[in-house]
Swiss-Prot record:
GO MF annotations in UniProt: rRNA binding; structural constituent of ribosome; tRNA binding
Protein name: Small ribosomal subunit protein uS7
Sorted UniProt keywords: Ribonucleoprotein, Ribosomal protein, RNA-binding, rRNA-binding, tRNA-binding
Protein source organism: Beutenbergia cavernae (strain ATCC BAA-8 / DSM 12333 / CCUG 43141 / JCM 11478 / NBRC 16432 / NCIMB 13614 / HKI 0122)
Highest taxon, organism lineage: Bacteria
The keyword Repressor belongs to this UniProt entry's keyword annotation: no
NCBIfam families: rpsG_bact (TIGR01029)
Family matches, as InterPro entries: Ribosomal_uS7 (IPR000235), Ribosomal_uS7_bac/org-type (IPR005717), Ribosomal_uS7_CS (IPR020606), Ribosomal_uS7_dom (IPR023798), Ribosomal_uS7_dom_sf (IPR036823)
Length: 156
């Protein structure tokens, strides 16, 4: 444990195109091997595709998609007397957003469309409509927390 305490959160640079820190976070999530311009091209292309398909503001659609994917509960392992319990815990808002973005990007990577831009665009559209693998992951996480509610008293 460091004696100085936790490192302070650095301010996030606001996205130049949409003026949204959420889009910047998404670009950083898509980033592979430090190729930021490629990641920006993928994300901006996906958001342009969202604009074309919905005739609406892509930042709003992205926000709705993240709201549909963001978990409120998750399970953490807790060892008690030789047995490991899956204890349901509330998710901090910053972690919930990070998980939602991670799931959106991860499940868009395994989709079957040809380019990453198309895959990300379709996953965002599906998530904004309450469909898709990322939303299913959130439902599975909530179901796991619900089924282990009996162990909630082991919370720390």
């Amino acid at each position: 444990m460091p004696r100085k305490g936790p490192a302070p959160k650095r301010p996030l640079v606001v996205d130049p195109v949409y003026g949204s820190p959420t889009v910047t976070q998404l670009v950083n999530r898509v980033l592979v091997d430090g190729k930021k311009s490629t990641a920006e091209r993928i994300v901006y292309g996906a958001l342009e595709g969202v604009r074309d398909k919905t005739q609406g503001d892509p930042a709003t659609v992205l926000k709705r998609a993240l709201d549909n994917v963001r978990p409120s509960l998750e399970v953490k392992s807790r060892r008690v007397g030789g047995t490991t319990y899956q204890v349901p815990v509330d998710v901090r808002p910053s972690r919930a957003t990070a998980l939602a973005m991670r799931w959106l990007v991860d499940y868009s990577r395994v989709r079957r469309e040809k380019t990453m831009t198309e895959r990300l665009m379709n996953e965002i559209l599906d998530a904004s409509n309450g469909l898709g693998a990322a939303v299913k992951r959130r439902e599975d996480t909530h179901k796991m927390a619900e089924s282990n509610k009996a162990f909630a008293h082991y919370r720390w």
